[in-house]
């Protein structure tokens, strides 16, 4: 079992590393490529577009051909794309590399969640996804620090050499450590209970959890996107104060994420999901009424705690009904989360909504809709919580 957890964690970490590692070198990259920082900031959207593109195909391929081939190819694409970015001499080539980086990271991301669905029952899966969320929160804090240390002695290209090395390591883990987890075809007596046709992506329970996770990701990405404006322009923080504040909020996320597995031993998943949305609602109301920086910071802290306590549980529930189509389900969740959050941020910008109101709006909207869905759509107990995986006995 340890091999599956190790490989899943490594596969997921390519996604945040690809976002955060290069940011510290952005001014120097812009200067060398004769582009403005504003022009290169689109690299974030291009990276997410690459992820969404990969997710369109990676899930179905993983269900048909296996998790392992997709993981190996995804890591290889990420590695080669990182080298392409390091060799870029102008902006368009750099953005092409960023898109391909997203493709590689997106394929690995989908496979990681499919592997966890294949190998863990619902209770353990919720705990592991919460831990995974906590580990993911470490990357936005450590990656810029590592990037800064690298650039003290080496040029910005070294950042992408480092990411390329990460791709190589993940590829080697996928090749030599990861074992295939795609479930074997079921006996005829089992087909009525679990078949690709029966595991529909349009059933009410999956759609409800897809909506909850998409709204939750929209909350956290809106927070990340709006945080520079809120903290440095509205609240008057310096760059150093901003970095410290974001590190502290990431610390809150880590503590809550690592505590959630223990909470799952005491409370039902539904209770933790309601607590998560209650924290979002409280955060939205706090920010709307805040008149001091202290109160505003308290509201921002509630956002991080709310996301960490509920997201892993909701993702586990969303993947629960799928054994033969875990890859497709994981892809669908990823696409909805990336596209849904990007759409909200884009619409808010087009409509001229301020950073604070953008954040308050998604917090209150997410919490109300999610609470209604949690109460109105319960898990389907006719679906087995865990499917036996023939490969598990070999771990």
Curated annotation (Swiss-Prot):
SUPFAM superfamilies membership: MFS general substrate transporter
Gene Ontology CC terms: plasma membrane
Main location (coarse class): membrane
Its membrane topology: Multi-pass membrane protein
Lineage, top ranks: Bacteria, Pseudomonadati, Pseudomonadota, Gammaproteobacteria, Enterobacterales
Organism of origin: Salmonella heidelberg (strain SL476)
GO MF annotations in UniProt: transmembrane transporter activity
Protein name from the UniProt record: Multidrug resistance protein MdtL
InterPro entries: MFS, MFS_dom, MFS_trans_sf, Multidrug-R_MdtL
